[in-house]
Amino acid sequence: MKQIFIGIIRFYQKCISPLTPPSCRFYPTCSNYGLEAIKTHGALKGGWLTIKRILKCHPLHPGGIDPVPPKKEK
């Protein structure tokens, strides 16, 4: 499942993103955030963090630096 999500994001980065002007308000970009979140937290939690991030990426949000939260140790 994790590899499927990573593949979808990579496809977006290589095939769709170059066709549109840069518009992400955050650093790292939403797609890079998604890759890092899924690699760090797995498909379920990383996917959820990515969805939350994409929903924040709009003209009314100031944007800025928003790193992936570190994985909590148990």
Curated annotation (Swiss-Prot):
<comment type="function">
    <text>Could be involved in insertion of integral membrane proteins into the membrane.</text>
</comment>
<dbReference type="GO" id="GO:0005886">
    <property type="term" value="C:plasma membrane"/>
</dbReference>
<comment type="similarity">
    <text>Belongs to the UPF0161 family.</text>
</comment>
<keyword id="KW-0472">Membrane</keyword>
<keyword id="KW-1003">Cell membrane</keyword>
<dbReference type="InterPro" id="IPR002696">
    <property type="entry name" value="Membr_insert_effic_factor_YidD"/>
</dbReference>
<protein>
    <recommendedName>
        <fullName>Putative membrane protein insertion efficiency factor</fullName>
    </recommendedName>
</protein>
<dbReference type="Pfam" id="PF01809">
    <property type="entry name" value="YidD"/>
</dbReference>
